[in-house]
Amino acid sequence: MQKVALVTGAGQGIGKAIALRLVKDGFAVAIADYNDATATAVAAEINQAGGRAVAIKVDVSRRDQVFAAVEQARKALGGFNVIVNNAGIAPSTPIESITEEIVDRVYNINVKGVIWGMQAAVEAFKKEGHGGKIVNACSQAGHVGNPELAVYSSSKFAVRGLTQTAARDLAPLGITVNGFCPGIVKTPMWAEIDRQCRKRRANRWATARLNLPNASPLAACRSLKTSPPACRSSPARIPTI
């Protein structure tokens, strides 16, 4: 039976690259994104190439929508085995410019979105009668704070902690939980960060070069062990690329 994965934020960038990699590895994939048009385009690209995918519009900050998206994927694709909680935002926020609105928006998407995704996946795994795999997008910014990204960095520190804790909580259920930590990747999100910062502080970043999105699926799909043998443990690995 074909395995099923749902990837949030899969309409572009790293999320799209992960979805394409999963399809290459034999998965049917739910392309979940806030932007319905980009999700539909990615799903169409996969289906036209002989893969199997569905597009699902979802606002990951809304718990009810995340649960509905996972259930839709489970029914449409005939099962549920993996969720990749990849969706996130990274507004430029120097300390003195942080507002309550920015904090709420970033944490609602980057942190709550991961929590809702993990909860929805656990529910789906239980319905399917087996364990499964949860993969959360962390970041190098979740290890070392980066200038002008205080709120984003702190949200990724939170995701890192959630991932390590969930790995221990869910291991008895046969559910593995891991994270992957990309550095600066050439994606639309990074282009927006760069636009906001105007490169004026580029020399302060820990990583100077831009990685390509196709590097991240290797961390998300290989280092995080989405293959069957990984069911024996839940190491909460958080590789940095």
Curated annotation (Swiss-Prot):
- Where, by residue number, does substrate bind? 139
Report the enzyme's class at the first EC level. Answer: oxidoreductase
The GO terms describing molecular function are: diacetyl reductase ((S)-acetoin forming) (NAD+) activity
The record lists NAD(+) as bound by 6-30
Task: Tell me the InterPro entries matching this sequence.
Answer: 23BDH, NAD(P)-bd_dom_sf, Sc_DH/Rdtase_CS, SDR_fam
Reactions listed under catalytic activity: (S)-acetoin + NAD(+) = diacetyl + NADH + H(+)
* Gene3D superfamilies given in the database record: NAD(P)-binding Rossmann-like Domain (3.40.50.720)
The EC number(s) attached to this protein equal 1.1.1.304
Q: Which residues form the active site?
A: 152 (proton acceptor), 156
Sorted alphabetically, the keyword list is: NAD, Oxidoreductase
One example of a Gene Ontology biological process annotation:
acetoin catabolic process
Q: Which domain of life is it from?
A: Bacteria
Question: According to its UniProt entry, what is the function of this protein?
Answer: Catalyzes the irreversible reduction of 2,3-butanediol to (S)-acetoin in the presence of NADH.
Q: What interactions and quaternary structure are annotated? A: Homotetramer.
Give the UniProt family note. Belongs to the short-chain dehydrogenases/reductases (SDR) family.
Name-wise, this protein is Diacetyl reductase [(S)-acetoin forming]
GN (gene name): budC
